[in-house]
Amino acid sequence: MLNATPCLFEINVDLVGRYKKKMKKCALLLAIIFGWLQPLTVHAQKTVTVAIAANMQFAMEQLKVEFEKETGIKVELITSSSGKLSAQIAEGAPYDVFVSADMKYPQDLYDKGFATGTPKVYAIGQLVLWTSKPGLKPTADLKQLLSAAIKKIAVANPKTAPYGVAAEETLKYYKLYDGLKDKLVYGESIGQTQQFIETQAADIGFIAKSQVLAAEMKGRGAWVEIPGNAYTPIRQGAVILKHGKDTNNAAAGTFYAYIFSDAAQQIFKKFGYIVN
């Protein structure tokens, strides 16, 4: 009996040791699995990357605050001209939702398979003539643009920015384009166009009404709204992108739906957009 006891003790120690090793391996494996999955899950559910046209910058910053407060989903905004953003999306940029300044670019992305559905109008933009030059006050008939005192007129590049298209249409509507085309300086986006005017690199220029109504712009310069019959209505559309559906469907869908909510529409209206 005395000889048997050490043997039993050794067997028990061996079993316990092997059990502990197996448990450690399982714990390590679970830690690796959950450590790898958790960031992906959190990112998919808690962050949405939204490409926005530059005219939407100020309105979307306010919308972002309200959306994050209501849903707990973080919003990352990527701002540029609609044309440039569209090109980035076509080249594989990892954006979830595209909020354009027109319907053409999002429709083109849908036609090429980069968006999950046809674009839907979320707002209609309005064009203004704005200056930050002291003593200069824009007039609705635009004839003052012919003055020798005005040497540079800023517009967004019509090749990539819908508000640039509207600006050129306006000048042609008033039969001023040919006489003013040598004065035109082009911003890459409506945001850069605003910078040209704000820094007085241009004397005056065409930007979005949403920009001059932003709190950051209060009291800066003078502006006049361009009559809506002078240019094609700026119908602004949004789409969920294929990347958003494939990798972040819940967050992308939630943000897209919010754009058309009463809360979002009131924000757009506050910034001078025409809404339903």
Model regions and ranges:
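Charged/polar low-complexity intrinsically disordered segments
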Residues: 10, 20-22
